[in-house]
Amino acid sequence: MLMITSFANPRVAQAFVDYMATQGVILTIQQHNQSDVWLADESQAERVRAELARFLENPADPRYLAASWQAGHTGSGLHYRRYPFFAALRERAGPVTWVMMIACVVVFIAMQILGDQEVMLWLAWPFDPTLKFEFWRYFTHALMHFSLMHILFNLLWWWYLGGAVEKRLGSGKLIVITLISALLSGYVQQKFSGPWFGGLSGVVYALMGYVWLRGERDPQSGIYLQRGLIIFALIWIVAGWFDLFGMSMANGAHIAGLAVGLAMAFVDSLNARKRK
């Protein structure tokens, strides 16, 4: 099967599927974060994409509405899935996403009980030459958060972006992005501020860059990030760099993470194009 496109609005997706059915082409919809349209007979891909281009120019054209009437999908037959809060969390997060979230929460609780300094002595970037072979330190700095707002903000983005990557591209891809971005963003940040820093934001920015550029260059990957959100991320970096909000931010980690994510997305999308 071949994924043709994704629609944010499930009714629009259904309208296109109904119209193609009247043209003798069977498409199916799979609901994830968006409504993904799949084609079973890949020999019809060129024809479907041509029709999709015409559809996107004017989805409200009467012929599409007529097709929906013919297929019987204009009423309330389209069912929207409703999830309780925790069910929604489970639906959009794979095992790696969950393990990271749980690890961050456990470390945060430990920091509240034992104190920041005690936990940092074990998890911070190597702050002494004798610690350079304690390899976990190059990654575990990402688990430490210093306020409730800090951890909530990072874990929300981690769940949203990391969950999408894991669901679409697999746990292995999320692990690779996480490890590389934690290592490189941590390296850059310690050059800026020394070893006493923490937080998942370097990884989050890597995921932002990765999901946005991979979605732009390889829509069939099934991941995407609205351009408004990547613009927000850039504004946040600028605000942090110039200390506009009076908050201590790991600016080096943010910039390095974003660069890592963009670079990995460029390489992966290039490889995806070569395979076609």
Swiss-Prot record:
Enzyme Commission identifier(s): 3.4.21.105
Keyword Cell membrane: yes
Catalytic reaction(s) noted: Cleaves type-1 transmembrane domains using a catalytic dyad composed of serine and histidine that are contributed by different transmembrane domains
Primary location group: membrane
Residues spanning the membrane: 94-114, 142-162, 169-189, 192-212, 223-245, 250-272
Segments on the Periplasmic face: 115-141, 190-191, 246-249
Residues of the active site: S201, H254
Pfam name, any one: Rhomboid
Main enzyme class: hydrolase
InterPro entries in the cross-refs: GlpG_N_sf (IPR038236), Peptidase_S54_GlpG_N (IPR022732), Peptidase_S54_rhomboid_dom (IPR022764), Rhomboid-like_sf (IPR035952), Rhomboid_protease_GlpG (IPR023662)
Mode of membrane association: Multi-pass membrane protein
UniProt entry keywords in alphabetical sequence: Cell inner membrane, Cell membrane, Hydrolase, Membrane, Protease, Serine protease, Transmembrane, Transmembrane helix
Keyword Hydrolase: yes
GO cellular component terms listed in the entry, alphabetical order: plasma membrane
Superkingdom to which the source organism belongs: Bacteria
GO biological process, one term: proteolysis
Subcellular location: Cell inner membrane
GO MF, one annotated term: serine-type endopeptidase activity
Effect of G199C: Loss of catalytic activity
Domains as described in the record: The loop between transmembrane domains 5 and 6 is flexible and may readily open to the extracellular side to allow water entry into the active site cavity.
Family of the protein in this entry: Belongs to the peptidase S54 family.
Protein's name according to its UniProt entry: Rhomboid protease GlpG
Organism: Escherichia coli (strain K12)
